[in-house]
């Protein structure tokens, strides 16, 4: 099969890389970095950006359709100066996301963490009324 959706490592790329990725892949799955000056064509420094994630799929200024990862990830331990994030916190984020009509709820789960934690998240998100679908169905 030919890949149709791209995910940048750690949801991070330069402005130029986002444009290049868009030439090969019409769809990305991720949170994304938006760089200062992207909409105005003005120059900005390499660290003049902010992370952006949406409650639903969007077309971004780099010319790509972006499927959001907007609930974060399960992380039982403090890492990279980020506090632990437990299964219930991912579910709570999905519940808060329901303030939006037709919201998409998407999260990341590392495969080396215990499967029962993933099952808690899935059950909790389903209990909030979400339906799980493949990423290609969101296009």
Question: Residue locations for each model-derived region?
Answer:
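Amphipathic alpha-helical segments that form well-ordered structural scaffolds
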Residues: 1, 20, 120-124
């Amino acid at each position: 099969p030919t890949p149709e959706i791209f995910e940048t490592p750690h949801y991070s790329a330069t402005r130029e890389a986002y444009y290049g990725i868009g030439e090969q892949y019409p769809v990305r799955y991720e949170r994304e970095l938006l760089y200062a000056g992207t909409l105005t064509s003005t120059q900005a420094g390499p660290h003049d950006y902010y992370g952006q994630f949406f409650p639903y799929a969007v077309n971004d200024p780099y010319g790509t359709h972006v499927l959001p990862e907007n609930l974060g990830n399960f992380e039982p331990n403090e890492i990279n100066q980020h506090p632990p994030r437990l299964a219930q916190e991912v579910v709570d984020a999905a519940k808060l996301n329901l303030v939006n009509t037709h919201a998409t709820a998407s999260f990341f789960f590392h495969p080396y963490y215990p499967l029962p934690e993933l099952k808690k998240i899935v059950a909790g998100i389903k209990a909030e009324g979400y339906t799980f679908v493949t990423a290609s169905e969101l296009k």
